[in-house]
A protein has these predicted regions:
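A glycine-rich helix->loop->beta "capping" turn
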Residues: 59-62, 82-95, 101
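A short, exposed helix-loop element centered on a Lys and neighboring polar residues
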Residues: 128-129
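The beta1-alpha1 cofactor-binding region of Rossmann-like NAD(H)/NADP(H)-dependent oxidoreductases
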Residues: 47, 67-79, 110
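Active-site loop of short-chain dehydrogenase/reductase
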Residues: 6, 61-62, 89-90, 135-138
């Protein structure tokens, strides 16, 4: 199976495993929308949606960098609309965005837990729900 011309909507993806997945799909000629908050470099982590897009395009894929916080329903709606407008639909949804805490449970502040829950559970559910109508058409 080839991903040539298929459109992937990915949350996260500006670095780490998400970027590696996107690069693999780019090598097949896929269209990849990278929806993440990383428009500017993080002081401790390399990569932005723009640097990821350059890497994707350098490997033969088409990229659409979208600034998006997947906790925000309006931002997700707008990101999906931008992807559909640019590429004509969505064939694959990859929920890659995540928030983690390297601390033991007893030392994890509730504010950090709330962030992890909003991104990892709610954001994943919402993105899947919002992509579903497009995936059914694919």
């Amino acid at each position: 199976m080839t991903l040539q011309g298929k459109t992937i909507f990915m949350s996260g993806g500006s670095r780490g495993i998400g970027l590696e997945i996107a690069k693999r799909f780019a090598a097949d000629g896929a269209n990849i929308a990278i929806a993440a908050k990383t428009a500017s470099p993080h002081p401790k982590l390399s990569g932005t949606i723009y640097t990821a897009s350059k890497e994707i395009e350098g490997l033969g894929g088409k990229a659409l960098p979208i600034v998006c916080d997947i906790r925000n329903e309006e931002a997700v709606d707008n990101a999906i609309s931008s992807c559909v407008k640019q590429f004509g639909g969505i064939d694959i949804c990859i929920n890659n965005a995540s928030a983690v805490s390297p601390t033991p449970t007893t030392l994890t502040p509730m504010k950090r837990y709330d962030l992890m829950n909003e991104v990892n559970a709610r954001g994943t559910f919402m993105l899947s729900q919002k992509c579903h109508p497009h995936l059914k058409k694919a």
